[in-house]
């Protein structure tokens, strides 16, 4: 099991449903300003945003590095693949990366990813993503939390240092025989300064909006157009 698959198993215990819906609404409202007929959702998760855009008449494809997430998408009849976004064929009117997907990449990987996304955009295409602010990492994401049900227990311990957030997930799930299976892994996220996004070859940063998702100004929305 990859660390992203562990996240997929634990996501329902994190209490992020309201924040996820708020992000979906924000992205959807931004895309309303453009004539989007095709969309690629990078880091599509369980496909919630694709479902919303499909209801608006947009043809959607999703990619995610969690096989569990992709399986759930396919079970809903959504077009999703478990592979790096750079390996997806075709061009799209819009590409989105929702809920700090970019923060999961180190600088060099991120720059390569952004250039590959530019290549997958139609002329005048739009790419929208959100990132955590420094405050979002140091004051909001850092810390501990736990949650449990009759069948599961989750502990999350996050520490931010040297512009990296290391989040350890420990999940216990009850088996049919009454015993518990333990899953544990660490996910690393990276803080990126806005200046990094202002010097791209294939994408032009046309708008940035710092907003509050969990707390005051903990996220920034980035809107790019293809150069």
PLM feature segments, named:
Residues 46-86:
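Class I SAM-dependent methyltransferase SAM/SAH-binding core
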Residues 86-95:
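A short acidic, Gly/Pro-enriched loop at the edge of an enzyme's catalytic core
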């Amino acid at each position: 099991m990859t660390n992203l698959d562990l996240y997929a198993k634990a996501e329902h215990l994190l209490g992020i449903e309201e924040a996820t819906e708020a992000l979906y609404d924000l992205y959807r409202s931004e895309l309303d300003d453009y004539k989007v007929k095709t969309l690629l959702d990078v880091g599509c998760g369980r496909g919630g945003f694709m479902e919303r855009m499909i209801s608006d008449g947009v043809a959607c494809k999703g990619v995610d590095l969690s096989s569990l997430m992709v399986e759930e998408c396919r079970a809903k009849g959504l077009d999703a693949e478990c592979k790096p976004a750079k390996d997806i064929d075709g061009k799209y009117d819009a590409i989105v990366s929702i809920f700090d997907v970019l923060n999961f990449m180190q600088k060099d990987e991120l720059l390569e990813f952004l250039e590959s996304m530019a290549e997958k955009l139609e002329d005048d295409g739009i790419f929208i993503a959100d990132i955590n602010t420094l405050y979002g990492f140091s004051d909001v994401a850092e810390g501990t939390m736990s949650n449990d049900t009759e069948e599961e227990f989750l502990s999350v311990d996050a520490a931010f240092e040297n512009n990296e957030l290391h989040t350890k997930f420990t999940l216990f799930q009850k088996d049919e025989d009454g015993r518990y299976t333990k899953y544990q892994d660490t996910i690393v996220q990276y803080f990126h300064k806005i200046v990094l996004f202002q010097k791209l070859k294939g994408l032009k940063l046309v708008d940035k909006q710092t907003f509050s998702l969990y707390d005051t100004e903990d996220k920034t929305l980035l809107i790019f157009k293809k150069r």
